[in-house]
Amino acid sequence: MEQMTITAKIQIVVDETDKVLLDETMSVYRNACNYVSDYVFRTHDLKQFSLNKVLYSTLRENFNLKSQMAQSVLKTVIARYKTILENQNEWMKPSFKKPQYDLVWNRDYSLTQNCFSINTLNGRVKLSYFADGMSKYFDHTIYKFGTAKLVNKHGKYYLHIPVTYDVEESNVSDICNVVGIDRGINFVIATYDSKNKSGFVSGKAMKQKRANYSKLRKELQMRQTSSSRRKIKAIGGRENRWMQDINHQVSKALVKNNPKHTLFVLEDLSGIRNATERVKTKDRYVSVSWSFYDLEQKLIYKAKQNQSSVIKVDPRYTSQCCPCCGHIEKANRNKKMHLFTCKNCGYKSNDDRIGAMNLYRMGIDYLVDSQVPNTVVTE
């Protein structure tokens, strides 16, 4: 068994009285985070014990935080600093702009009699909720709740709850199906599986929509007004949500349309942002900013839920190698025509399909001999 964690997003029903209590608590929590962030930035201290020793009394007295809230503020700030250090490798002070509140399970929030009980600065409030397919996660004999985040989005309140549960591990010996997945621009994905079946998800409409977003963003940037900057931010959020929804649908379909114990094989595209020189200028925005990583992560956790696995392999020559005779030559591929023609044996097919076929073959090689340290990167 291995553990898996997903985030359940649950809307809670808030009346005007409860809204005042929640807003006040979230605002004070946010202000306390900024206070602690200032101190951490000056001292470079990221230890919970020493921060608690110096700041706990101030958080309790000056911000009127309850004991657990004060501890949670410290953890929230420490986590934010560590994330910045991991991603940017430099010392920067994070600013907490939006009101927020991190709630510890069974201390700051609990679930009783079909209501969430949430702690505020002025006592607990009991709130009903809309499950929207999330009620299955409320069986605490199977699912364990973690520290939730309370957010206010366009006047609606949500609990983002990390839910952890056990899933059966997928062993190499159990694999019964292999799917090679080639990701790109003209086709979001092209697939090839153990039944010799190919599949395609066209990227034409998505490519056009992203180009429209890019054009609109450039037009707004030229105006350089506060209104245009707000619109640019709103467009960015809209585009990201749209992209994430597409990746959710694609990854869900991949898992749903394949049996348990499937091995999904992806190219390791970790260097995609540094590969713009190999992409047509008009396609660079689409290629470089396309959320390959988001699709990859969504597929990984959905595959685990279905007792399946994902591996990433070296992408070199996957578009130049003939899957029939193994001949590798750059001239095999006509990028403009999206056509692959082997100069050795004459085999012809769509170039994205060829990529998927070669990834499928590498998946088979992995199953035959999993000791391929220079080629295969397992998750």
Regions found by a protein language model. Give the residues of each.
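Positively charged, helix-rich recognition surfaces that bind polyanionic ligands
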Residues: 4-8, 16, 20, 154-379
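Generic detection of short hydrophobic beta-strand segments and adjacent strand-loop junctions
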Residues: 4-12, 123-132, 136, 199-201
